[in-house]
């Protein structure tokens, strides 16, 4: 039986480049080389597109992306592969673009009656005074995060307006043009993966995620010694509710 020609994308220009490398290492360690003829495409930090010429001249049968953040998750890479008629694993162009933009994703979910935390969306170039009253109506502590970032990079817990100003300044100088300020929810961190199967979307097991503090931060996610998740001990009816919400969100 011929091996499947599998292309794996890694690197990229995103600030999450190092996370991408770790994901790629994990993928390669678990892919069966007896089943797949694997080509790794390294996307350089400087944006050089030589990798794209290689994938065009010798296209794989399918692509598995280990890219994190930026063009790797916002629909850009997905659109590129779509235009080349190269199948790829993961969300398609529109869903990738929406999900990478947290404010847009929350707007879409609210329109479909899926509960999301209260938030204020702060844009670069708009005077802060236009947001200040809305923020003051929220109850501290609040979460301040990049609107289009991942891996918890740039996320802080704000306990007063001084923290809010610091968080916005830090994010806009380093990570993103737009900032999301959200209600802080001190509760369980739950994961529920949804996969599209032959019979439609199916929710996987509900997992409890262990975290070192009250916020699920970068170190919790990517330092293996500190990260763990287990099948939840939540009652069955709560697990069913979580799975139902996960599938509904997937379908949206």
In which residue ranges do the predicted regions lie?
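ATP-dependent carboxylate activation and anion-phosphoryl transfer catalytic cores
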Residues: 2-4, 113, 235-252
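Glycine-enriched alpha-helix->loop->beta-strand junction motifs that scaffold or abut catalytic
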Residues: 85-87, 114, 199-200
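Active-site nucleotide/adenylate-binding loops and adjacent lid/helix of ATP-dependent enzymes
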Residues: 2-9, 38, 55, 98-182, ...
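ATP-binding N-terminal substructure of ATP-dependent carboxylate-amine bond-forming enzymes
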Residues: 1-94, 98-100, 104, 123-132
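Solvent-exposed alpha-helix faces
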Residues: 25-26, 169, 247
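Generic secondary-structure signature for well-ordered alpha-helical cores
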Residues: 33, 114, 173-177, 211, ...
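Phosphate-binding site of ATP-dependent enzymes
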Residues: 159-244
């Amino acid at each position: 039986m011929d091996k499947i020609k599998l292309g794996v994308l890694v690197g990229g220009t995103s600030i999450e480049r190092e996370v991408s490398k770790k994901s790629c290492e994990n993928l390669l360690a678990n892919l069966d080389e007896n089943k797949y003829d694997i080509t790794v495409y390294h996307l350089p930090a400087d944006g050089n597109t030589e990798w794209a010429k290689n994938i065009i001249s010798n296209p794989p049968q399918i692509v598995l992306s280990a890219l994190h953040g930026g063009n790797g998750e916002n629909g850009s890479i997905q659109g590129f592969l779509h235009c080349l008629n190269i199948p790829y694993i993961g969300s398609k162009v529109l869903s990738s673009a929406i999900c990478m933009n947290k404010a847009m994703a929350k707007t879409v979910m609210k329109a479909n009656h899926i509960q999301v935390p209260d938030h204020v969306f702060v844009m670069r170039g708009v005077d802060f005074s236009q947001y200040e009253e809305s923020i003051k109506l929220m109850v501290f502590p609040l979460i301040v995060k990049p609107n289009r970032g991942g891996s918890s990079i740039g996320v802080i817990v704000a306990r007063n307006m001084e923290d809010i100003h610091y968080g916005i300044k830090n994010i806009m100088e380093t990570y993103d043009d737009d900032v999301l300020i959200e209600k802080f929810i001190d509760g369980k961190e739950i994961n529920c993966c949804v996969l599209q199967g032959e019979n439609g979307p199916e929710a996987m097991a509900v997992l409890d995620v262990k975290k070192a503090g009250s916020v699920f931060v970068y170190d919790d996610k990517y330092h293996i010694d500190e990260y763990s998740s287990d099948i939840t001990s939540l009652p069955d009816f709560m697990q069913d509710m979580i799975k139902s919400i996960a599938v509904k969100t997937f379908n949206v």
